[in-house]
Amino acid sequence: FFETIKSYSISSKELKKRVIFSDIDELNHKLEKKEKVLVLTSHQCNWEWLLLASQLNLNQPLNVIYKSISNRNIDKSLIKSRSRFGSKLIESKKALLHIRRNIKKIGIIALVADQSPIKKNKKSWRILLNQDTAFFKSVEYLPRLLNSHVYFASMERLSRGKYSVKFDLISTPNQNLNKDILSEYVRKLEHQIKQKPDEWLWTHKRWKFTREDI
């Protein structure tokens, strides 16, 4: 909770000390070559710091797809906090249209992909932790739309208030059509949760509905 509040005021200098990247240069190299990158992450450790610190280490604006919340004042406050180092926030309901309109300008997109999609929206199903689980369809169609490299961003707590981040390649542009990117994401997500179950946000209502509820 303290770190969440700290997200609103932490300086770029302090954040760089607290979140260490081992291979973000690989992403910058792709962007320098005008190649697109999609980063899939999760509610592991401090995802707010992960996104903020990523922007500080990237040479292009990070486009973050997010789900808005009903309280407009809190939503505006979160947008202000998340974008203060240059990231661009894209509301999930408008994401597809925004990306299609701006596809030539967009270099890198991030999505916290373990969130539960809205019940009425289209979704894909995979088994996560022995539970039939709904995921955003965008995890499947965005790599093909963008013709992007796809990375899984994993975060690990080193000590109190200090983390390391690693980017694992899931797919490349020439693999996207034939690869089950969502299944690979779920596999990496489950492995991460099992390795450090105490660092995943179990309270974010991941299994709010089943296939039978749809």
Regions found by a protein language model. Give the residues of each.
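Membrane-anchoring hydrophobic helices of lipid-metabolizing enzymes
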Residues: 1-41, 75-76, 80, 86
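Short acidic/polar alpha-helix capping motifs at helix-coil junctions
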Residues: 15-17, 42-44, 61-65, 102-106, ...
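A short linear-motif detector with a strong N-terminal bias
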Residues: 17-18, 43-44, 67-70, 88-90, ...
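Short hydrophobic/aromatic-rich motifs at helix boundaries and adjacent loops
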Residues: 22-24, 48-52, 70-71, 110-113, ...
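Non-catalytic C-terminal accessory region of glycerolipid acyltransferases
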Residues: 29-32, 36, 56-57, 93-214
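Catalytic core of membrane glycerolipid acyltransferases/transacylases, capturing the structured
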Residues: 35-93, 118-127, 131-133
